[in-house]
C-alpha cells in the first residue's frame, strides 16, 4: 500500500512537470496524430506502462467556440478505472487547451455498447481528425510490458455503424476482472486483493452470518459515515466525493480569469492552486482507502485500487523479518520499554508462526536463526483452491488483521514509566492474543459482532440446559415437598401427645423472667428428645413451615434491689439538707443497709445485677474529708475549761473542708526539710484526737464503724497510708491542743507561723460546734 501511494505520488509529480512544457504542434493526418501521441507518451514518462493517459481531443470547425467544462472521454458502463489512470486523466485535462485561442472542445460522445471482444472500459478517439488545427494527443506507454495470463492485449477496434468512423482503444484489464482471473488461476495470490474479497460481514455464502447479527453494526457504521461527511462538509472544505467536481470547476474558473496569452492558458494557474488540486486528490484517495480498511466500504475506485495492489503483490517478492531491537537507544531523555514477544501476521510466537506458515515463498527470520517454512496438511490448496484462503480469512476474522505485508513496531519515549504500561508488561504473554488496556470496551465492528454471536450462543446453550435439567429439578422439588409434609405431621402428633409438658415448662420459665430465647430453647430440646433424627432433618432441609420460628413472649420487668433505690434517695436527701442533722442520721441507715444486703431474697440473688459505681457528684463531696473527722464518728464533749471559746478544730461537720494541701505542704517543706510529711486525708490519723474521745467502748465502736465505712465507701487512692507507715507522736490533751493553737505554735513543726486559712477554719469550727451543742 505504501509503495502504491509512493508510485502514485511520483506519477503525479512527473505529470505536473510534463504539463509545464509547451505542447507539440497539431497534425492534420492520423499518422501525425499517432506520432504526436507517441511523442507525448515519451514525454510523459509514466512508470506504469499499463495505465495509458488520454488527452483531450479537439472538435472540428469551431473557431469561435468557447471553452466549456472539461470532461474526460473515458466512458465505462461500470465507472471503474485505475486510481493512477484517474489521476493521470485528471492531470491530462490540464494539457487539453491548445495553443490557439480559437480552438474549442466538442462535447463528450455518448458511451457505446461493448462489442467485438473489446473491454468494457474503452477510450473513444475520432479516427478521422478534422482538417483544421488540432489533433489527438495520447500518452501511450514507452515500454509496454507483455500481457500476463489474465490480461488482455492493448488493441484497437472500429465500431460499426453509420456516421464518422471511431477508433476504440482498449485498456488492459488489470482491474477487478484481471485480479479475479489471476486469483482463480493460481492460489499464490496474497495481499490486498485477497483480503478485499473476504472483507465485510457477508463475504461468501457459506461463511456469511445472519443479518440480525450485523444489522446494528451496519446501522452504526452508516450513521457514523453520515455524521462524518456532514461535519466534513460543514467545516468549509470539499467533501471527498465532490473533490473531483470542485477541482474541475476551479480549473475552469481559474483558467478563464487573469491574463491569458496565446500560450499562457496553463500558466494562468498559480502555484497554490496546483498544490490545492494535488492535495485534494490525495486526500480523496486516502479517504477512500480509510473507508475500505476500517468501515468495509468498497466502491469502484477502491476496487480498482485493490486490483492494482493485487497485481503489485503478485509481481513483487516479499521478505518478512521478525525480531527484536537489540541496540537500546542512547539518546538523552529516551528510555526503551521492552514489549511483548514480536509476533507474526496472525499474532503468534515467531517459531510457531514459522512452523505453520501458509506460503512457501516466505522466509521467516527470528533473531539470527533462519527457520524454513513448512506447509501443513490443512494449509495445502485443495481441488477448489480454498486451503490458503480459508486459513488467512480465519486468522483475519479472529484477530482482526486486515492485510499484512510487513510489521511495523512503534516505540514511544516517555520521561517516566506509566503505571498502566508497567501492569501490562508484568502480565505473562499469552500466544495468539492481543493486550488491550483495561477499561476500553471492544468498539470495533468485528468485536460487536463477536459479542452478539457469543450472546446468542449462550442463550441457546442455556435454554438447552434448562430443558435437560427441568425434569430433574421437578423431581427434586416433589421429593422435598413430600418429606416436608411428613415432618409437619410428625410434629403435630408430638405436640398433641405432650401438651402438658410444653406449656407448664414455658410458664415456669416466663415467671422467673429469662430472655425470650430460653423458653424456645427448652421447647426445642424437648422436641429433640422426643424425635431427634426427624427434628434435625426438618430444621436443615425443609423451610416451608414457619410455625415456631418466631416466638413473642412477655418479659417481666426486673426491679432494682431496695439497697440501690434507698441509696439514691439518701443521696438526694443529703444534697437537699446541708445541715448536721441529716448527716448524723445518715450513718445508721447506711450501716443498716449494709447489713441488709446479706439478707436479700433468693430471686434477687438469682439474676446477677451489674455493679454500678455511685455518682461522682455526691461521693466526691463526701470523700473529700476522711470519715474519721465527721460528726458521725467523733462526737465532741464540752469540757468545763477556761478556754470554752477555743473548741477543737478537729470536731467539724461532714461538709467542712481542710485548707488546701499545697500551702501546708509548702510550709512544711520550708520549715523542716527533713521532717516526714503527714497527710490530713489519711484514714488512720486518729492519734491526734485520742484525748478528745472517751476510753473503752468509744474507741472500739470507732474501729468497727471505720472498718464498715471503709468497705462501703469508695476507696481513695491519692493519699492512703497503712497503719504501720503512719508516724505516731505523743497525744495531746485538749488543754495542750488549745494552748498550742492559741499561742500560734504549729502542731507538726512547732513554729509560730499559722496560715490564715487555718485560723478562719478554726473560728468556723467553734461557731458550728456551739450551735450543734
Swiss-Prot record:
Coiled coil: none
Region (Disordered): 18-155, 173-210, 232-264, 568-613
InterPro entries: DUF3719, FAM149
Acidic residues bias: start-end ranges: 174-186
Biased composition (Low complexity): 18-37, 54-90, 245-264
One Pfam family it belongs to: DUF3719
Family under the similarity heading: Belongs to the FAM149 family.
Protein name: Protein FAM149A
Gene name, Swiss-Prot/TrEMBL: FAM149A
